[in-house]
């Protein structure tokens, strides 16, 4: 989950990372009041989850509260690379002597953590990597040893930060590592990390990505969710603890187990080439507990997707046997009633497959078609979607 800058800074404050005073708002009037309360020049900063805000006019210096009001009026509603500014951060402006770059991230390719540090801050780090690679330090971080003050100082030194700021920078770098670990982040980035004329080291910007797979350890992170930008179907699925991702096709997919669902997406996409190019509409893994309630919740989400024309239920019975899955489907259709109005193709295999198929045959629901194989089911679901 990507955070807005103001949310990242909330985590920074929580862990003692020095930053600048500021508050978030969604009105120009509040921006003026906040600026007056701060009593110093401020920065008005668009809160969008995309880079290039400054170049797009989303970051402005305001010397007075009236300037803050004017800039806030112009920035609120500003479109930055397709992201509409709905909130702004009003933060105290700081005098800057130098700008640096620091980040911690998950290096998936090398299966480790990585610290990146550069004396060339304030510009796109991709540009630094391309034009001045020798100025960007990439330092692997041992997950067990972590980052102590000595190692943090080494990171700053390898990033070519001036000798006179190494100790102060090390303190901030270690605290940023604390944010990374304690909050289960996959990215913590500060650009710029600044040195003031008074030799303070401050995080004047912040980017944090949280690992949603660790969300169970952080119920407090729920407040960071950007509800306005989240697909309502994905929100509904999350409320029911369903592993759901919306796609752009016409065939709804329900399966048990991520691997099976991924395979089903491929098979449906391939079958769709013979039926007008229809594609999978979603990824939905109901896991091992395919109860009536879980199946009903899954079908409810998929059937409320206007793009879905048919549904392919592909289940391999294991711990949860096929007869339990079949009963779940029958009961789910009863629960949904008239809301179940799109054809379902069901393929069962594995534990108690014969019993499961018998249950569905005897139920004789007009929307349900049985398939013997995954290929057959995918083809039938694609055919039904293309015909609607």
From Swiss-Prot:
Substrate binds at residues 256, 318-320. Residues 9-236 form the ATP-grasp domain. The gene is sucC. Binds 1 Mg(2+) ion per subunit. Its cofactor is Mg(2+). PANTHER family: SUCCINATE--COA LIGASE [GDP-FORMING] SUBUNIT BETA, MITOCHONDRIAL, SUCCINYL-COA SYNTHETASE BETA CHAIN. Belongs to the succinate/malate CoA ligase beta subunit family. It catalyses: succinate + ATP + CoA = succinyl-CoA + ADP + phosphate; GTP + succinate + CoA = succinyl-CoA + GDP + phosphate. This is Succinate--CoA ligase [ADP-forming] subunit beta. It comes from Nocardia farcinica (strain IFM 10152). GO terms for cellular component: cytosol; succinate-CoA ligase complex. Transmembrane segments: none annotated. PROSITE patterns: ATP_GRASP (PS50975), SUCCINYL_COA_LIG_3 (PS01217). Pfam families: ATP-grasp_2, Ligase_CoA. Keywords: ATP-binding, Ligase, Magnesium, Metal-binding, Nucleotide-binding, Tricarboxylic acid cycle.
């Amino acid at each position: 989950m990507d955070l807005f800058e103001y949310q990242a800074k909330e985590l920074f404050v929580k862990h003692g990372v020095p930053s600048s005073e500021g508050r978030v708002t969604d009105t120009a009037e509040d921006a003026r009041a906040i600026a007056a309360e701060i009593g110093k020049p401020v920065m008005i900063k668009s809160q969008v989850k995309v880079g290039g805000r400054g170049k797009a006019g989303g970051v402005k210096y305001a010397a007075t509260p009236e300037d803050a009001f004017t800039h806030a009026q112009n920035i609120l509603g500003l479109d930055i690379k397709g992201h509409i500014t709905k909130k702004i951060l009003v933060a105290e402006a700081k005098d800057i002597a130098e700008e640096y770059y620091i980040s911690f991230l998950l290096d998936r390719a090398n299966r480790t953590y990585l610290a990146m540090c550069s004396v060339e801050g304030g510009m796109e780090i991709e540009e630094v990597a391309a034009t001045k690679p020798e100025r960007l330090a990439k330092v692997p971080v041992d997950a067990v040893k972590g980052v102590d003050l000595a190692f943090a100082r080494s990171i700053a030194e390898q990033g070519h930060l001036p000798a006179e700021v190494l100790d102060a920078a090390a303190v901030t770098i270690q605290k940023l590592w604390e944010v990374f670990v304690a909050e289960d982040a996959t990215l913590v980035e500060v650009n710029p990390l600044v040195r003031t004329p008074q030799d303070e080291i401050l995080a004047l910007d912040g980017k944090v990505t949280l690992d949603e797979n660790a969300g169970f350890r952080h119920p407090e992170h729920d407040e960071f969710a950007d509800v306005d930008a989240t697909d309502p179907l994905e929100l509904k699925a999350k409320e029911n603890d369903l592993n759901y991702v919306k796609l752009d096709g016409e065939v709804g997919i329900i399966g048990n187990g991520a691997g099976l669902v991924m395979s089903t997406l491929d098979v449906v996409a391939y079958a769709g080439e013979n039926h007008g190019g229809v594609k999978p509409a979603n990824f939905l893994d109901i896991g091992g507990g395919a109860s009536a309630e879980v199946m009903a919740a899954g079908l409810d989400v998929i059937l409320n997707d206007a793009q879905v024309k048919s549904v392919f239920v592909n289940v391999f019975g294991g711990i949860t046997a096929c007869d339990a899955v079949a009963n779940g489907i029958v009961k789910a259709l009863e629960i949904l009633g008239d809301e179940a109005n799109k054809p379902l193709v069901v393929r069962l295999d594995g534990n108690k497959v014969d019993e499961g198929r018998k249950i569905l045959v005897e139920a004789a629901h007009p929307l349900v078609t049985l398939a013997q194989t995954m290929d057959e089911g995918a083809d039938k679901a694609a055919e039904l979607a293309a015909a609607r």
